[in-house]
């Protein structure tokens, strides 16, 4: 070991490669990864906080936007039937459409069965796992590299791991993303409808004043890729409905953003901010770069200590499910599975951890079109999501298998079609199980 | 079909954010290591059987807790029903070691009237060049709290089996001696399946050869 003096100090040595060690990060700007901008900011920031490279920023922001637009690519929009309904989003039409989508889907499922290799969802067995691994089976697992040093008595046949199914479906999703449903409506009809939807969006967005109500209705059933960036900005209130005011507003907001950076960036190494900065520093590499999307507004309750907001929402979900599907509810209760054990993450991460990223994006098209989409409607989506697995849930008769299933739902291959179905069902539930009618403004 | 096991132990894995709790558990239960791991939200659940002696299997149910402070109110609900725990720190992160004491205090408050058998785990021992905590001082701290100390690496699969299996054996001994007893309303230890309940012929044959003490 090192000498006393050295030992006292050795951990203070610079550890530039330690995960989570405090390092200078120059990526806290928008757009990131622009060496020119880095240089300018670095030099300019301490002395001349006000004005460097304005024009540059805008052009590189646009560059950034187009460079990263493929993050929105995965999966084509979307379901034609819902699209038509959205044109006049009144209850009857949507309800009728929801039913039609569900009906249509079950027919497609029927048609699809013979020609398709059984995916995990279609399998008759209640398995959350890849087909190669038998379900419901507890197995002895040996870490590959350690197996010769321990557990000498393992029998050879017992080595298949008890797998969690894809807990991070993003990579898989990226691989399968963009493949459209082969059994969807005839492609020409579909693309025709898509083209006309896209036209409607473009007309609306062109102004001079975008009708936000109309835009919401249109967006409910999914926003076509090319217009999604602008549509999200309008729906989230980031940019104004008036077309002429948009460039100036965008410029102002970006300026504000850079002002925040200049204001707070240097404070990151202050003692009081060490823990926060450390956590951020650790979390950023863990986020998929594709996941850098607009954050919804969330109440403070949700992300403060003890997260009372999130816990309350889990309780609300429980209450809702008990009314929607008493059998599932009782089954979970009987096996001592608590909603907090699986649904906490659903609420905390808005299902982002449960479905592939392109599904989350599609989901958020609708969340931004629904009144209180991210809070209230999300509850119904979660309820629909849980009940979606009722068959599998009811077949599991053991706490452990239930919880493993619910924490690792087999959604890795989900596409927009699945999300559309989920949303249609959620919408139906919202009307059928309304707890208070005034939730449904218009 | 369930395999036969003598006991079921519930374990909890705690420690600062990013010390490698989830990666350690994944290595143990799935036999693999992911370079990038999402932060745990709330509590994740894992399970695995271990064989502590030929024919003697223990079913482990493992609660993987989020290290981040804001999830504490969720995670602390799981102390009470745990019989064993792995308390992790990251040997390349001094602060995570300094927080070991706080973690023990935190559990002490919430586990009563039960107790958790803890092992102190110095994780990421493959990163020895970036070490900020010596083995000696970690052993000293562990001894002061009556814990064993072990250094592990999920990346290189060092001591991962041993950390879990040793803890399991220690708990098993305590159960056998009657120092830990199965109690109504406590999930820490449950007794296993009685062989004749199991219908799989293969399992029954296996168990008949064995002495279930």
Swiss-Prot record, chain B:
The modification Cysteine methyl ester is found at residue 213. The keyword Phosphoprotein applies. SUPFAM superfamilies: P-loop containing nucleoside triphosphate hydrolases. GO terms for biological process: autophagy; protein transport; Rab protein signal transduction; regulation of autophagy; synapse organization; vesicle-mediated transport. GO terms for molecular function: G protein activity; GTP binding; GTPase activity; myosin V binding. It is a lipid-anchor. The modification Phosphoserine is found at residue 201. Residues 35-43 are annotated as: Switch-I. It catalyses: GTP + H2O = GDP + phosphate + H(+). It is found in: Cell membrane; Cytoplasmic vesicle membrane; Golgi apparatus; Cytoplasmic vesicle, Autophagosome membrane. GTP binds at residues 17, 20-23, 37, 40, 67, 123-124, 126, 154-155. InterPro entries: P-loop_NTPase, Rab39, Rab_GTPases_membrane_traffic, Small_GTP-bd, Small_GTPase. Regulated by guanine nucleotide exchange factors (GEFs) including C9orf72-SMCR8 complex, which promote the exchange of bound GDP for free GTP. Regulated by GTPase activating proteins (GAPs) which increase the GTP hydrolysis activity. Inhibited by GDP dissociation inhibitors (GDIs). One of its GO terms (cellular component) is plasma membrane. It is an enzyme of class 3 (hydrolase). Keywords: Autophagy, Cell membrane, Cytoplasmic vesicle, Golgi apparatus, GTP-binding, Hydrolase, Lipoprotein, Lysosome, Magnesium, Membrane, Metal-binding, Methylation, Nucleotide-binding, Phosphoprotein, Prenylation, Protein transport, Transport. A lipid is attached at residues 211, 213 (S-geranylgeranyl cysteine). Its cofactor is Mg(2+). Residues 67-83 are annotated as: Switch-II. Interacts (GDP-bound) with C9orf72; C9orf72 in complex with SMCR8 acts as a GEF for RAB39B. Interacts (in GTP-bound form) with PICK1 (via PDZ domain); a PICK1 homodimer may allow simultaneous association of RAB39B and GRIA2 to PICK1 which is involved in GRIA2 trafficking. Interacts with isoform c of RASSF1; the interaction is strong. Interacts with isoform a of RASSF1; the interaction is weak. Interacts with the DLG4/PSD-95. Interacts (GTP-bound) with HOPS complex components VPS39 and VPS41. Switch I, switch II and the interswitch regions are characteristic of Rab GTPases and mediate the interactions with Rab downstream effectors. The switch regions undergo conformational changes upon nucleotide binding which drive interaction with specific sets of effector proteins, with most effectors only binding to GTP-bound Rab. Belongs to the small GTPase superfamily. Rab family. This is Ras-related protein Rab-39B. It comes from Bos taurus. The lineage of its organism: Eukaryota, Metazoa, Chordata, Craniata, Vertebrata. The gene is RAB39B.
